[in-house]
C-alpha cells in the first residue's frame, strides 16, 4: 500500500484546527503524538458500551473487558516480536517501566560495589532511577561520553565494563539528537561481560520496526502516547526467565495468589504480579487501536516517508542564518537547534505565533544540555502526519525571526 500523508492527516482531528489564526503545524510529536480518530473512538466506545473492571468478574462485561485487555497484550507482543505475550507488562509509560526494573530486578541483583552503565544522552527517566538505585545500595553509575556530533564514544565502552557491571541502560534513539544507537554491538558486548541490557525505546517504536528477539535485549520499554495512543499506558518487555524471577514492586489487588494475616501473601505469576490494582483498561484499549493503526499503515512505509521528510528538512534548514543544529545528519524523528544567541523559549514563542508547535527547554536531558553548554534548545519533531509544507513554514518562520531579532 502506498503511503498517503493526506489520508493519514484526515484521521487526526486536531490537525484541522488553527492556532493564532493559522493552520496548526504540530512539530512536537516526540513529546507526545496526536491521536487518530480510530484511537479516540476505540477508547470512547469502550467507556460507552463495554466498560467493566477486569479480572475475576464472571459477568459478560467483565469477561469481555478482560479478553480485550489480554488481546492488546498479544497484539503488543507481535508488534515488537516478543516470544510470548506473557513477557509484556502494562505500565503507565516508559518512566514507570524503568522504575519497575530498577525497584524489582535492580533491588534484587545490584549490590554495593557493582556498577551500572548509562550514556550522556539519556532522558532523565533513564538516569534518575539508576542514580536512586545506586545511592540505595552503594553501586557506581558509569557514563558513556558523547562525541560533538551527538554519537556515543563507543571506543570507551569496553573500558567501562568489568566483572561488577550488572546493567547497561541505553536509549534506542535520543529524544534530543535523534541519534540511533548501535544496539546490536552494545548488547553483545554487555552480554559478554555478563550484564543485562535495558533499552529505552520511547523514541524508536513509532519510526521503524522493533524486534526484541533480534536485539536480544533483556528489557525494552516504550510509551503509548508517543505512538499515537493514549496517555498513561505503556509496555515493559522482559525476557520470560528474568520476569519470572523478579519480585513485585507494588502490592495490592490483582497481583496476589493468596493473602493471609497469619501466613502472609503469595504472588500470582508474571506478568500479572506487576500489575497491582485496577488497570488503565481504557488506555489499554486505545493502545491496541494505535498499534493496529500503525501496523495497518506499515512501519516500513512510515519509516521511508519520515526519512525523506527528514532529509528535506535538514537541507532546507541550511538556508537559515545563524542556526545551530545539534546531532548528526543521520537521525530519526527530531531536530534540535538554537537560533543565534536567542533563548529557545523566545524562538519557540515566535514560532507559536506563526501556528508552529515546537518543544523548548532542556527536554529532560540536562546532562546533554551541559555537554553542549546551552541552557535549552528548540526541538522540532517529524511524524508520519507532517508535511513538506510544514517544514517550509518552519524554515520561513525561523528566517523571519532572524530578521526581526538579528
UniProtKB/Swiss-Prot annotation:
Active site (UniProt): 364
PROSITE patterns given in the database record: AA_TRANSFER_CLASS_5 (PS00595)
This protein's pathway: Cofactor biosynthesis; iron-sulfur cluster biosynthesis
GO cellular component: cytoplasm
Record GO biological process: cysteine metabolic process
Keyword RNA-binding recorded: no
Reported cofactor(s): pyridoxal 5'-phosphate
Positions of post-translational N6-(pyridoxal phosphate)lysine modification: 226
Enzyme Commission identifier(s): 2.8.1.7, 4.4.1.16
CDD domains for the chain: SufS_like
Catalysis performed (reactions): (sulfur carrier)-H + L-cysteine = (sulfur carrier)-SH + L-alanine; L-selenocysteine + AH2 = hydrogenselenide + L-alanine + A + H(+)
Keywords annotated in UniProt: Cytoplasm, Lyase, Pyridoxal phosphate, Transferase
SUPFAM superfamilies named among the record's database cross-references: PLP-dependent transferases
Record's subcellular location: Cytoplasm
GO molecular function term, any single one: cysteine desulfurase activity
Assembly notes: Homodimer. Interacts with SufE and the SufBCD complex composed of SufB, SufC and SufD. The interaction with SufE is required to mediate the direct transfer of the sulfur atom from the S-sulfanylcysteine.
Stated family: Belongs to the class-V pyridoxal-phosphate-dependent aminotransferase family. Csd subfamily.
Function, in words: Cysteine desulfurases mobilize the sulfur from L-cysteine to yield L-alanine, an essential step in sulfur metabolism for biosynthesis of a variety of sulfur-containing biomolecules. Component of the suf operon, which is activated and required under specific conditions such as oxidative stress and iron limitation. Acts as a potent selenocysteine lyase in vitro, that mobilizes selenium from L-selenocysteine. Selenocysteine lyase activity is however unsure in vivo.
Name assigned to this protein: Cysteine desulfurase
Species of the source: Shigella flexneri
Gene that this polypeptide is encoded by: sufS
Amino acid at each position: 500500500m502506498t503511503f498517503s500523508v493526506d489520508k493519514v492527516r484526515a484521521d487526526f482531528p486536531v490537525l484541522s484546527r488553527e492556532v493564532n489564526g493559522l493552520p496548526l503545524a504540530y512539530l512536537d510529536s516526540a513529546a507526545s503524538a496526536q491521536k487518530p480518530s480510530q484511537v479516540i473512538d476505540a477508547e470512547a466506545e469502550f467507556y460507552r458500551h463495554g466498560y467493566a473492571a477486569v479480572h475475576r468478574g464472571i459477568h459478560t462485561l467483565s469477561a469481555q473487558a478482560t479478553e480485550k485487555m489480554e488481546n492488546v497484550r498479544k497484539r503488543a507482543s507481535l508488534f515488537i516480536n516478543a516470544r510470548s505475550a506473557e513477557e509484556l507488562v502494562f505500565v503507565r509509560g516508559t518512566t514507570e517501566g524503568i522504575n519497575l526494573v530498577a525497584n524489582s530486578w535492580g533491588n534484587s541483583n545490584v549490590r554495593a560495589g557493582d556498577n551500572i552503565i548509562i550514556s550522556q544522552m539519556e532522558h532523565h527517566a533513564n538516569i534518575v532511577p539508576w542514580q536512586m538505585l545506586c545511592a540505595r545500595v552503594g553501586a557506581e553509575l558509569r557514563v558513556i561520553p558523547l562525541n560533538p556530533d551527538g554519537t556515543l564514544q563507543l571506543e570507551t565502552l569496553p573500558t567501562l565494563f568489568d566483572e561488577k557491571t550488572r546493567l547497561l541502560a541505553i536509549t534506542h534513539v535520543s529524544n534530543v539528537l535523534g541519534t540511533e544507537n548501535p544496539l546490536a554491538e552494545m548488547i553483545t558486548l554487555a552480554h559478554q561481560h555478563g550484564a543485562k541490557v535495558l533499552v529505552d525505546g520511547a523514541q524508536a517504536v513509532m519510526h521503524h520496526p522493533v524486534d526484541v528477539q533480534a536485539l536480544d535485549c533483556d528489557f525494552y520499554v516504550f510509551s503509548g502516547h508517543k505512538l499515537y495512543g493514549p496517555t498513561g499506558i505503556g509496555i515493559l518487555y522482559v525476557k520470560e526467565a528474568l520476569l519470572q524471577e523478579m519480585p513485585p514492586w507494588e502490592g495490592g489487588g490483582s497481583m496476589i495468589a493468596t493473602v493471609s494475616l497469619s501466613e502472609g501473601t503469595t504472588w500470582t505469576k508474571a506478568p500479572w504480579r506487576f500489575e497491582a490494582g485496577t488497570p488503565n483498561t481504557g488506555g489499554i484499549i486505545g493502545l491496541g487501536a494505535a498499534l493496529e493503526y500503525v501496523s495497518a499503515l506499515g512501519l516500513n512505509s512510515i519509516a521511508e516517508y519520515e526519512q525523506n521528510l527528514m532529509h528535506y528538512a535538514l537541507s532546507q534548514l541550511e538556508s537559515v542564518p545563524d542556526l545551530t543544529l545539534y546531532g548528526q545528519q543521520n537521525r530519526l524523528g527530531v531536530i534540535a537547534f538554537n537560533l543565534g544567541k536567542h533563548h529557545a523559549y523566545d524562538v519557540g514563542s515566535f514560532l507559536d505565533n506563526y501556528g508552529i508547535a515546537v518543544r523548548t527547554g532542556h527536554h529532560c536531558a540536562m546532562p546533554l544540555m551541559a555537554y553542549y553548554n546551552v541552557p535549552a534548545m528548540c526541538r522540532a519533531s517529524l511524524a508520519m502526519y507532517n508535511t513538506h509544507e510544514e517544514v517550509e513554514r518552519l524554515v520561513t518562520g525561523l528566517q523571519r525571526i532572524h530578521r526581526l531579532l538579528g
